[in-house]
From Swiss-Prot:
This is Mediator of RNA polymerase II transcription subunit 7. Keywords: Activator, Nucleus, Transcription, Transcription regulation. Disulfide bonds: none annotated. InterPro entries: Med7/Med21-like, Mediatior_Med7, Mediatior_Med7_sf. GO terms for biological process: positive regulation of transcription initiation by RNA polymerase II; regulation of transcription by RNA polymerase II.
Length: 376
């Protein structure tokens, strides 16, 4: 490997590797002849005449077809790619994870059971994917829509309260605000940090019983969707807190912006876990589209087949007599060769044409219908 080869591989459009110059016609013929001799177990020193042993090894490696990789990594355009397509965790990138590990399998998913009134988590379980899809999907969708609607109302109420608090606190004079800001300690990132789903879960793990002692209706949703909902609410809360900080102490905004960045990275990582599901669904949609196209083509061929059979049936219904038609054609030919003379010959020709007028009219009408239908 030449010293410049490693640098060339990392360019946007790398040039071909330098060993392509070895693929000359002479070397190819030598390698082919050597392979044939090795297959026949014959030793011939004149078959390959390399200069050194290193040239023998290099030619053997270059002209040998590489085997397909089954594991490990490979390089392409200077980047290293993995064959197993494993999604790295946030911890590997040095980013804190705000949710617990989700243990979803190929055929089963982790489900959270919680109380919609108090948002208290009762427990977690595992459910097969097909069983969860069959378990009243319409009712689950309605419950989730109602829950989202109530959550949006709660967010609006919280935002209104926070804005009112900010307005009430900004009413005093500027001097009092400056004194409060100077006397107040800097906001600690841990106190006003991102509201992680794990910490919120511990706070929400309260008793699911109501004041009357009766258990309310519980909802089961996938753990991933539950964590995404919590992270979205935490993101909204941190954004509202950022607005309050910008109104009171703008110099303290970096910690809150960092919290928002961590929340967005966690949301992005959770959403990326749906990529395999998205690829499967996209493949299913493409296959369904191809199937519909093939079915439409088959139906089109069937309609053309029906039209052709109907046309042939109409032709059969005319009931042509080939012997009589042959006689008529011969009489026409003879009349053309020998011009008609006299009133008797003229009457014979008229009677001959009048017999076949009806059949000719029917055939012409049928041909007109067929031509019009084909043109349309």
């Amino acid at each position: 490997m030449e010293p410049n080869e490693g640098v060339q591989l990392f360019s946007a459009f790398p040039p071909p590797p330098p060993y392509y110059k070895l693929f000359t016609r002479e070397n190819i013929e030598k390698v082919i002849s050597n392979m044939e001799k090795e297959a026949k177990h014959e030793d011939d020193a004149n078959t390959l005449q390399p200069k050194t042993e290193e040239e023998i090894e290099s030619l053997a490696k270059l002209f040998k077809k590489p085997s397909c990789l089954t594991s490990g990594t490979y390089q392409m355009f200077g980047d290293t790619w993995r064959l197993d397509e494993a999604i790295p965790s946030l911890k590997e990138f040095g980013i804190p994870e705000l949710y617990k590990d989700i243990k979803d399998g190929e055929d089963e998913i982790e489900v959270v059971e919680y109380d919609p009134k108090s948002n208290a988590i009762v427990g977690t379980s595992f459910t097969r994917v097909h069983d969860y899809d069959k378990n009243s999907p319409i009712e689950n969708e309605k419950i989730l829509e109602d829950d989202q609607h109530t959550a949006m109302k709660e967010k609006d109420n919280e935002s209104d309260k926070t804005m009112k608090d900010v307005e009430e606190k900004t009413e005093p004079s500027l001097k009092k605000e400056e004194e409060d800001i100077q006397m107040k300690e800097p906001l600690d990132s841990q106190d006003t940090g991102a509201v992680s789903a794990s910490s919120v879960n511990e706070g929400f793990r309260a008793d699911q019983k109501s004041k009357d002692g009766e258990t309310s209706d519980l909802i089961k949703i996938p753990r991933r969707a539950y964590e995404l909902r919590f992270l979205s609410r935490s993101l909204m809360l941190n954004f509202l807190e950022l607005l309050g900080i910008m109104a009171k102490a703008p110099e303290q905004f970096p910690s809150k912006v960092e919290n928002i960045r961590v929340l967005l990275l966690n949301l992005h990582h959770l959403i990326n876990d749906y990529r395999p599901h998205q690829s499967r669904e996209s493949l299913i949609m493409l296959l369904e589209k191809q199937l519909k196209h093939e079915e439409s083509q088959v139906e089109l061929l069937r309609t053309h087949n029906r039209q052709m059979t109907e046309t042939l049936e109409k032709y059969k219904s005319l009931d042509f007599n080939m012997e009589k038609e042959g006689d008529v054609i011969q009489q026409l030919k003879s009349s053309i060769k020998k011009p008609l003379s006299g009133a008797e010959d003229e009457q014979k020709s008229r009677s001959m044409f009048s017999k076949n007028d009806e059949k000719l009219k029917k055939s012409l009408e049928l041909m007109e219908d067929v031509i019009k239908r084909d043109l349309s």
